[in-house]
UniProtKB/Swiss-Prot annotation:
Binding annotation for Mg(2+): 255
Keyword Secreted: no
Organism: Exiguobacterium sp. (strain ATCC BAA-1283 / AT1b)
The organism's taxonomic lineage, starting at the top: Bacteria, Bacillati, Bacillota, Bacilli, Bacillales
Identification of the protein by name: Phenylalanine--tRNA ligase alpha subunit
Main location: cytoplasm
Length: 340
């Protein structure tokens, strides 16, 4: 048994020396010192030894076990140090290499257009007014000359929450609220914000989009003031060479009402495939505030008048930057967003 123990020590120490990973060293430990290992078998067989042999073999077994364990511990520390050094070498940073610059964030194209239009109108003396996106039927329709039985309500398929509350279909409710709060005083505001309609999403329609509506109420306001304001707006946003024209239209909250066209960007008014041969592209709607709307808001329509207009933000962005699908604004595709 003495020779067996000495042979075990030689074999174990040699395997420890050859092991190069913590896993292989753990395998050596289990092989020689585990519950089913040869050292355990030797110790179990000591009961068969004579009284004279037992202390000698027991002392030798403990010496061999201690030698194997201490050699294992020392080798594990060596391997740990080697593995750490290799890891550090692999993760070493070359400080002479140029650093990676992070991509700076920027405003979304729609926000850029909104900021540009807001700055433009603020420069013309307008203030910015805002209101809730969840509106009452009163402000979204009735205060804008759209009573419950008005056929024009069918033109705006709405998201109703209850019978009397809905997601606003335009930012005009902000105008109604502002007029009521003004107590008959002059107003010059723009109202930017999200609006919602039950449209099928396609290249030119979205169930959610953004508007900027404008409202001016004062004495002696005329259609000429509306036309002059929109001419300034178009020339500053799209360039001095752009012209506008007004066409008769119908909106319940304005009378008279107009559609506003801009001279074609591609052909300059001569006629092409973009403008469908007309030389003009429709961009927004507006008109003189209906006397009923003024009266419901507390104004004397015999003394004051006003004009209003509504601008689709996505429409402006598509025209100015040549975007052909409104859905690009909301898909969060960086390939599109990073172009602007």
């Amino acid at each position: 048994m003495k020779e067996q123990l000495e042979q075990l020590q030689v074999e174990a120490l040699e395997e420890i020396k050859q092991a190069s990973t913590q896993k292989s060293l753990n395998d050596v430990r289990i092989k020689y010192l585990g519950k089913k290992g040869p050292m355990t078998e030797v110790l179990r067989g000591m009961g068969k030894l004579s009284a004279e042999e037992r202390p000698i073999i027991g002392e030798l077994a403990n010496t061999v076990r201690t030698a194997i364990q201490s050699t294992l511990d020392a080798r594990i520390e060596e391997v740990k140090a080697i593995e750490l050094e290799e890891k550090l070498k692999a993760e070493t940073l070359d400080v002479t290499l140029p650093g990676r610059t992070s991509t700076p964030g920027h405003s979304h194209l729609l926000q850029q257009i909104i900021d540009e239009m807001e700055d433009l109108f603020v420069g013309l003396g307008y203030t910015i007014a805002e209101g809730p996106e969840v509106e009452t039927d009163l402000y979204n329709f009735e205060m804008l000359n759209l009573p419950k039985d008005h056929p024009a309500r069918d033109m705006q398929d709405s998201f109703y929450i209850t019978e009397e509350t809905l997601l606003r279909t335009h930012t005009s409710p902000v105008q109604a609220r502002t007029m009521l709060e003004a107590n008959g005083k002059p107003i010059r505001i723009i109202c930017p914000g999200k609006v919602y309609r039950r449209d099928e999403d396609d290249a030119t329609h979205s169930h959610q989009f953004m508007q900027i509506e404008g409202l001016v109420v004062d004495e002696s306001i005329s259609m000429a003031d509306l036309k002059g304001t929109l001419e300034v707006f178009v020339k500053q946003l799209f360039g001095e060479t752009r012209e506008i024209r007004l066409r008769p239209s119908f909106f319940p909250f304005t009378e008279p009402s107009v559609e506003v066209d801009i001279s074609c960007f591609k052909c300059g008014g001569k006629g092409c495939n973009v403008c469908k041969g007309t030389g003009w592209i429709e961009i927004l709607g507006g008109g003189m505030v209906h006397p009923h709307v003024l009266e419901m808001a507390g104004y004397d329509s015999s003394k004051v008048s006003g004009f209003a207009f509504g601008i689709g933000v996505e429409r402006m962005a598509m025209l100015k930057h040549g975007v052909d699908d409104i859905r690009h604004f909301y898909t969060n595709d960086l390939r599109f967003i990073e172009q602007f």
